[in-house]
């Protein structure tokens, strides 16, 4: 009986991102839930040059969700979530590294008309990415990146969401989003800044277990005060242009213990290069390449099965390719890997996992990007 219950509960936990939250208060239409998790994790790799791929990656997250019933039609709500790194020293300069607010927003929900909230939240492009962000550790590591326009979590998100299309169409969900300007400054880097933008997503449950969705976004890019090619998004030496755009579509099947999903996305002038360099003709050493990809194509596939015993094996493929990079570089993979993983759920609160990222980038890849295979091993307690 316990195993059958696990088979039902675990997919729900994966979709919700947390186990059953602890109810702190529930009285007179006011409710407050506390949730969190501790992830004790280690990366293992034979990396010689990138120590971060062979290191402690443990962290804890804690958050709350609250709501208040204003009247029989209107409900107020809010959510906050914070991440604490567990791999830092207590007193050195790294003590606060990795500690950050992940989510923080408040809003109103008007029955069949949907909800409106504002704050630090997920961008609508992540509505699609969530279909394949299912691996124990290495999910959402292709083209999505925090504080990069509306790809995933970011600041100044004004979001309207509606389920079942005003109560008229079961399974049809829509979202409209506006992101306010977050300009680079002395403390905020250019590659995590954005101009104002808008986006939308649409999701439809075709039949029980089968869902299709799509999303798009378009944002203004910024000029830094110095308006130079190294600090301006619009004038970047690589990936210049006035707007950052993205679209994505996905399909998933989630029923009877089987989870299958695929997503495809394209971006324009959105994704910054990270750790890239290129050996130009006539040079014997590589030169750093800094800027943005003119175009990115991203493909992700995930297959998982939930056994009654609590075991959940996973197989995934991710490829992120930059197109038409300037100065003769052309097309180049930014990420390409197969992910082989397994999670064992002892119960709804405790699990263990191993996640093996098989890096498919060749040692001779154009942008000299990291080619290490990585194994993540960990224990997770969540509530």
Curated annotation (Swiss-Prot):
Q: Which Pfam families match?
A: Porin_1
GO CC terms of this entry: cell outer membrane; pore complex
Q: Where mainly found?
A: membrane
Task: Give the top-rank taxon of the lineage listed in the UniProt record for this protein.
Answer: Bacteria
Write down the membrane topology. Answer: Multi-pass membrane protein
Q: Where in the cell is it found?
A: Cell outer membrane
Q: Which InterPro entries match?
A: Gram-neg_bact_OMP (IPR050298), Gram_neg_porin_domain (IPR033900), Porin_dom_sf (IPR023614), Porin_gammaproteobac (IPR001897), Porin_Gram-ve (IPR001702)
Q: Which residues form the signal peptide?
A: 1-21
Any ranges marked Periplasmic in the topology annotation, and which?
22-30, 71-74, 110-112, 165-171, 207-209, 253-258, 308-310, 347-351
GO MF, one term, reads: porin activity
Summarize the protein's role.
May play an important role in maintaining pathogenicity in plants.
Q: How does it assemble?
A: Homotrimer.
Q: Which family does it belong to?
A: Belongs to the Gram-negative porin family.
What protein is this chain from? Outer membrane protein Omp-EA
Q: Which organism is it from?
A: Erwinia amylovora (Fire blight bacteria)
């Amino acid at each position: 009986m316990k195993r059958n219950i696990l088979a039902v509960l675990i997919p729900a936990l994966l979709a919700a991102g947390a186990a059953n939250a602890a109810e702190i208060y529930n009285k007179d239409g006011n409710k407050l839930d506390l949730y969190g998790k501790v992830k004790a994790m280690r990366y293992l790799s034979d990396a010689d040059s990138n120590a971060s791929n062979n290191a402690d990656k443990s962290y804890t997250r804690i958050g709350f969700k609250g709501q208040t019933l204003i009247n029989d039609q209107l409900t107020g709500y809010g959510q906050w979530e914070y991440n604490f790194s567990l791999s830092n020293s207590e007193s050195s300069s790294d003590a606060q590294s990795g500690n950050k607010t992940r989510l923080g927003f408040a809003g109103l929900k008007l029955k069949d008309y949907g909800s409106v909230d504002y704050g630090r939240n997920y961008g609508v492009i992540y509505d699609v990415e969530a279909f394949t962000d299912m691996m124990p550790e290495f999910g959402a590591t292709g083209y999505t990146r925090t504080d990069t326009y509306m790809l995933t979590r970011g600041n100044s998100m004004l979001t309207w969401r509606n389920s079942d299309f005003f109560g008229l169409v079961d399974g049809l969900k829509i979202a409209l989003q506006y992101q306010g300007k977050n300009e680079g400054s002395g403390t905020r880097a250019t590659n995590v800044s954005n101009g104002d933008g808008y986006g939308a997503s649409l999701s439809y449950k075709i039949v029980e277990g089968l869902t299709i969705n799509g999303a798009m976004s378009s944002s203004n890019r910024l000029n830094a005060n110095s308006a130079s090619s190294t600090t301006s998004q619009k004038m970047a030496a690589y990936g210049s242009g006035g707007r950052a755009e993205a679209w994505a579509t996905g399909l998933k099947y989630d029923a009877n213990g089987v989870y299958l999903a695929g997503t495809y996305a394209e971006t324009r002038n959105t994704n910054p290069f990270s750790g890239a360099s290129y050996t130009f003709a006539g040079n014997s050493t590589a030169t750093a390449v800094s800027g943005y990809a003119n175009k990115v194509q991203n493909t992700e596939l995930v297959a998982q099965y939930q056994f009654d015993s609590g075991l959940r094996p996973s197989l995934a493929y991710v490829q992120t390719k930059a197109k038409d990079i300037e100065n003769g570089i052309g097309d180049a993979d930014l990420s390409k890997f197969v992910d082989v993983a397994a999670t064992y759920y002892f119960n709804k609160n405790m699990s263990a996992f191993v996640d093996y990222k098989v890096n498919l980038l060749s040692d001779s890849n154009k942008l000299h990007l990291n080619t290490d295979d990585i194994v993540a091993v960990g224990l997770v307690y969540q509530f």
